[in-house]
């Protein structure tokens, strides 16, 4: 048996030769599947532009369904759908322009913010009457004893890991 060609758009395979591949790639099922795939990645502005240029589909308006589906030459969107889509396009446009508005804000220095924070914390009365206790590390329930755990799952020593002098990595 010869090599087989698998089409990702159609999710099917066939014998790979020039005639079969050309016939498949120009076939209606393949073209529909390919269009459907690329339509998933279209932005709202392109969809809105296409839908505004189409006339409403009479069959879809009367029966609620159309035999042509997404390949119909006419629009299946109602006026309300078009308005919602235009609002979405406007929000996306504003979101793209937002970084331009951020550039106009005054530049704040980290040191200034830290100084203000330190002043605020020192002038505010302490709301805690008791000292802060260190949290005690506990292993999850159902884990094996600590001696059986690999080093990566064991708790760090109380003072932290000791630094190894002149250790080279890699």
UniProtKB/Swiss-Prot annotation:
The keyword Zinc-finger applies. GO terms for cellular component: U12-type spliceosomal complex. It is found in: Nucleus. A zinc finger (C3H1-type) spans 51-79. Transmembrane segments: none annotated. SMART domains: ZnF_C3H1 (SM00356). GO terms for molecular function: zinc ion binding. The keyword Nucleus applies. Its main location: nucleus. One of its GO terms (biological process) is RNA splicing. Residues 150-170 are annotated as: Disordered. Keywords: Metal-binding, mRNA processing, mRNA splicing, Nucleus, Spliceosome, Zinc, Zinc-finger. Component of the U11/U12 snRNPs that are part of the U12-type spliceosome. This is Zinc finger matrin-type protein 5. It comes from Bos taurus (Bovine).
